[in-house]
């Protein structure tokens, strides 16, 4: 007898699956749908910028070189046609590479747009299958709804549960959210989605080793793609009839709670249900490609840049104090040698030094030709001390505030002091109206780095400027617009 038949599923799994199957995003939140539209284009634009990096592109393409799947899943900005598992990895890798996509900060951190790669790959795959069976493909409004659900699952689990404190990387939540939602997109039944989701929880999960000194490295650029591709794989296995594990969380000795969490179950103190909260409150990286806990510090530094210059720059500075949150201290307060771009974009002292010296921060500043050759950066880093501001940390976790504050105080050698503080970064919901035109420009600028023809770029711009047309476009037509091989094909 199969004992699994008699087992009751862990409630956490049932709640996720019931939300994925039953919640009507479009009917509940216009704001969430509009924000998802912004997030989709912002993430694809980040991917276009990622394609400029050979570190990223060397990891992309089919697993077996020079193979192509006719009618396969496409990868924006390229001519690849891949199986959906490979496509999810490719899209996830390019979207995440420059650390410029959106962000969610709570007890756990992460980037909910990492789920988009799994959603797009699964949606194009099932839509191609639907067409072959004279069924309708998924529409882009279906993609936006799927995004909202992935964001919500990842973000709500992150609110009160810290995976980083037990050494696990936040991409575990990408795998979990993407598995539930992509299995649903593929047409999975409730039991099939439960089966897939349980396998996502009991999978091996990456450590945070590659995000911290002395081992910070490029895996943090492809970790999300890896999680997304695994989610698609687990979903496809469930669709093929693979079994699940009802008490994968609560089982004595071998369950997730015992193995990873000292038998403590997940907490849902801030939000006990899933809706559209996370998408509505998502944090966009509007201007600066750097770890999000440092975004307001960059803004402060750029505000202080003219004073820094007028006072004489590096040699005029006695010391600099950055007041920040406890998570920022834990993640991006770094001293000593920074070995690569991945190390530098996660160093608060580095990004502030660059912003003070140059009055801006770009991805190019992380490369060796700037970071190593311009010795002013490391000399200024040595003058910076980071300390926790307890009120900043409290407001960071306060659900009514959710601030990500930083302040910078510069003490000059002549005794003069200048301080600037910013509580909410430009990508915060509190500054959404200020951010929207900048997000639009960020996406349009990303098109300049692509190989699209001018007519194709005009077509993409037209789609971006017409959300109503976008909503009723099929995923297949959408991917045609963004595919190099057929980017010029007009869409009726």
Curated annotation (Swiss-Prot):
Keyword match Aminoacyl-tRNA synthetase: no
Pathway the protein contributes to: Organic acid metabolism; propanoate degradation
Record's keyword terms, sorted: Lyase
Domain of life, per lineage: Eukaryota
One MF term in the entry's GO annotations: 2 iron, 2 sulfur cluster binding
Enzymatic reactions: (2S,3S)-2-methylcitrate = 2-methyl-cis-aconitate + H2O
Protein name according to UniProt: Probable 2-methylcitrate dehydratase
Protein's organism: Dictyostelium discoideum
């Amino acid at each position: 007898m199969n004992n699994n038949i008699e087992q009751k599923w862990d409630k956490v799994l049932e709640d996720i699956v019931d939300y994925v199957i039953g919640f009507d995003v479009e009917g509940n939140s216009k704001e969430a749908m509009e924000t998802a539209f912004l997030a989709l284009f912002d993430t694809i634009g980040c991917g276009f910028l990622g394609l400029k990096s050979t570190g990223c592109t060397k990891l992309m393409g089919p697993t077996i070189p020079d193979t192509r799947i006719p009618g396969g899943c496409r990868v924006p900005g390229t001519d690849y046609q891949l199986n959906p598992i490979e496509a999810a990895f490719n899209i996830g890798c390019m979207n995440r590479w420059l650390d410029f996509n959106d962000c969610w900060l709570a007890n756990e951190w992460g980037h909910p747009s990492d789920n988009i790669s799994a959603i797009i790959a699964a949606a194009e795959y099932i839509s191609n299958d639907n067409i072959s069976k004279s069924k309708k493909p998924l529409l882009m409004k279906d993609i936006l709804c799927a995004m909202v659900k992935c964001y919500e699952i990842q973000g709500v689990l992150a609110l009160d549960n810290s995976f980083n404190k037990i050494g696990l990387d936040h991409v575990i939540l990408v795998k979990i959210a993407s598995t539930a939602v992509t299995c649903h997109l593929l047409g999975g039944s409730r039991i099939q989605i439960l089966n897939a989701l349980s396998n996502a929880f009991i999978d091996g999960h990456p450590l945070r080793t590659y995000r911290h000194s002395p081992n910070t490295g490029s895996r943090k650029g492809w970790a999300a793609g890896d999680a997304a591709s695994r989610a698609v794989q687990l979903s496809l296995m469930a669709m093929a009839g693979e079994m699940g594990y009802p008490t994968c969380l609560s089982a004595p000795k071998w369950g997730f709670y015992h193995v990873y969490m000292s038998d403590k179950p997940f907490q849902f103190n801030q939000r006990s249900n899933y809706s559209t909260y996370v998408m509505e409150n998502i944090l966009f990286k509007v201007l600066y490609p750097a770890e999000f806990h440092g975004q307001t510090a960059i803004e402060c530094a750029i505000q202080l840049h003219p004073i820094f210059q007028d006072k004489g720059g590096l040699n005029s500075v006695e010391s600099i104090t950055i007041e920040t949150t406890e998570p920022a201290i834990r993640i991006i307060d770094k001293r000593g040698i920074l070995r690569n771009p991945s190390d530098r974009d996660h160093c608060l002292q580095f990004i502030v030094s660059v912003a003070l010296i140059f009055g801006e921060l770009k991805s190019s500043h992380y490369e060796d030709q700037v970071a190593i050759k311009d010795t002013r950066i490391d000399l200024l880093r040595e003058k910076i001390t980071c300390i926790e501001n307890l009120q900043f940390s409290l407001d960071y976790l306060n659900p009514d505030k959710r601030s990500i504050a930083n302040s910078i105080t510069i003490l000059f050698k002549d005794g003069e002091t200048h301080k600037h503080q910013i509580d909410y970064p430009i990508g915060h919901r509190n500054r959404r109206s200020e951010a929207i035109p900048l997000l639009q420009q960020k996406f349009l600028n990303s098109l300049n780095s692509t190989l699209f023809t001018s007519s194709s770029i005009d077509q993409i711009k037209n789609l971006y400027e017409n959300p109503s047309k976008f909503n009723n476009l099929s995923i297949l037509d959408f991917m045609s617009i963004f595919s190099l091989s057929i980017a010029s094909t007009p869409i009726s």
